[in-house]
Amino acid sequence: MPGVKVKESEPFELALKKFKKQCEKAGILSEVRKREHFEKPSIKRKKKAIAARKRALKKQRKMMD
């Protein structure tokens, strides 16, 4: 869980920026968006297969160059 300790002389905007960066790095927002609506297991498998296919094609293109 991200947390930021704010110093006396530190402006709020800087602390907020640090917190947002930590949240992004931890993947909290993407996790929330993913869990926002129920996704059937069959759709999860389909998305996983499509992502694997994209990675394989990208790797293959990289090897060709």
Swiss-Prot record:
GO-annotated biological processes: translation
Keywords: Ribonucleoprotein, Ribosomal protein
MF terms in GO: structural constituent of ribosome
Transmembrane as UniProt keyword: no
One matching Pfam family: Ribosomal_S21
Bias (Basic residues): 43-65
Residues covered by region (Disordered): 39-65
Cellular component, GO annotation: ribonucleoprotein complex; ribosome
InterPro entries documented for this protein: Ribosomal_bS21, Ribosomal_bS21_sf
Family: Belongs to the bacterial ribosomal protein bS21 family.
Name listed for the protein in its UniProt record: Small ribosomal subunit protein bS21
Source organism of the structure: Pelobacter propionicus (strain DSM 2379 / NBRC 103807 / OttBd1)
